[in-house]
Design a protein with these regions (language model features):
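Short, ordered loop/turn segments at secondary-structure junctions
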Residues: 67-68, 91-93, 120
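Short beta-strand-to-loop acidic/aromatic patch adjacent to the donor-nucleotide binding site
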Residues: 112-120
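Short beta-strand/turn micro-motifs composed of small residues
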Residues: 35-37, 66, 118
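Conserved donor nucleotide-binding strand/loop of the catalytic core
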Residues: 74-110
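N-proximal low-complexity "stem/linker" segments adjacent to membrane-targeting elements
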Residues: 1-50
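Residue-level preference for short helical/loop micro-motifs built around acidic side chains
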Residues: 42-46, 71, 98
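Short loop->beta transition adjacent to catalytic acidic/histidine clusters or analogous donor-positioning motifs
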Residues: 29-32, 52-63, 85-86
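A conserved acidic beta->alpha catalytic loop
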Residues: 66-75
């Protein structure tokens, strides 16, 4: 398993697309669930409601990486009520793989030991 120092030295050589941190409440668990989204509308709200009902946030931190959603489905206060701990906004070119590279680099920099990815 990589230590944070090892991760930092490896990350220096990665080409990570630019992103902004819209919401970050800190790491609570050793694992996280990463959800890449773009204009998911009610679908992401329904999925987050189901995850909240199942208390997924009791076992892993939920981090959403947004590829420039314009449908208003990712209000920060609503996400916080559904136990989302992080919202990243990809600001450079690229599609899904760029979103995932942003999120994985962020998760490793935060010291997560396990990452689960689900489709938004």
């Amino acid at each position: 398993m990589s230590t944070p120092d090892n991760v930092s030295s490896v990350c220096e050589h990665w080409v990570v697309p630019a992103y902004n941190i819209q919401l970050w409440l800190g790491r609570q668990h050793p694992c996280c669930v990463i959800i890449p989204v773009i204009n998911e509308g009610e679908r992401i709200k329904n999925m987050l409601n189901k995850m909240h009902a199942l208390n997924i946030s009791g076992a892993a931190d939920i981090i959403i990486v947004d590829g420039w959603t314009t449908d208003g489905s990712l209000g920060v206060s609503a996400l916080q009520q559904l136990s989302v701990r992080g919202l990243l906004l990809k600001t450079s070119a690229g599609k899904l793989s760029a979103q995932l590279r942003c999120a994985y680099a962020f998760a490793l920099e935060q010291g997560y030991e396990g990452i689960v990815t689900i489709d938004g």
